[in-house]
UniProtKB/Swiss-Prot annotation:
This is Large ribosomal subunit protein uL10. One of its GO terms (molecular function) is large ribosomal subunit rRNA binding. Part of the ribosomal stalk of the 50S ribosomal subunit. The N-terminus interacts with L11 and the large rRNA to form the base of the stalk. The C-terminus forms an elongated spine to which L12 dimers bind in a sequential fashion forming a multimeric L10(L12)X complex. One of its GO terms (biological process) is translation. CDD domains: Ribosomal_L10. The gene is rplJ. Keywords: Ribonucleoprotein, Ribosomal protein, RNA-binding, rRNA-binding.
Length: 166
């Protein structure tokens, strides 16, 4: 009997560590998905560097309490799977949101970003954001635009002076 309790405590510690170390977590209800659809979802999440596991709600509830995350209890009903990302804050939300658009059976329940519980709508909003690399490239193009425009202006002035000299 105590071996089972120890195993459960170890599982709670493991889940708490995953929740603490992840930059984003998405909680979903996977009822109604076929095995093939779940396999497809898992492979998409794996490609994005996201871990996807099914846990008992009681274990997640205790782990969230241990990790200092409050407000998850109301979302931990029915079959629950958790997708966590420890590197890219939008990866889990992006893959889950995209998959949920194509598969109505996948229901986004909630999420956790940087220790704060977010709603399903907020998860979908985060999922529509560009990735970190996309945001960096947008920032770089915005920073390069004034320099590029200045270079074009200098080039145009130079060409205009050449035409006037002739």
């Amino acid at each position: 009997m105590s071996a089972i309790i120890e195993a459960k405590k170890q599982l709670v510690d493991e889940i708490a560590e995953v929740l603490s170390n992840s930059v984003s977590t998405v909680i979903v209800d996977y009822r109604g998905l076929t095995v093939a659809e779940v396999t497809d979802l898992r492979s998409q999440l794996r490609e994005a560097g996201v871990e996807y596991k099914v846990y008992k709600n009681t274990m997640v509830r205790r782990a969230a309490e241990k990790a200092g995350i409050e407000g998850l209890d109301e979302f931990l009903t029915g079959p629950t799977a958790i997708a966590t990302s420890s590197e890219d804050a939008v990866a889990a939300a992006k893959v889950i949101s995209g998959f949920a658009k194509d598969h109505e059976a996948l229901e986004i329940k909630s999420g956790v970003m940087e220790g704060n519980v977010i709603t399903a709508e907020e998860v979908k909003t985060v999922g529509s954001l560009p990735s970190h690399d996309g945001l960096v490239s947008m920032l770089l193009s915005v920073l390069q635009a004034p320099v590029r425009n200045f270079a074009y202006a200098v080039k145009a002035i130079g060409e205009q002076k050449e035409e006037n000299a002739e």
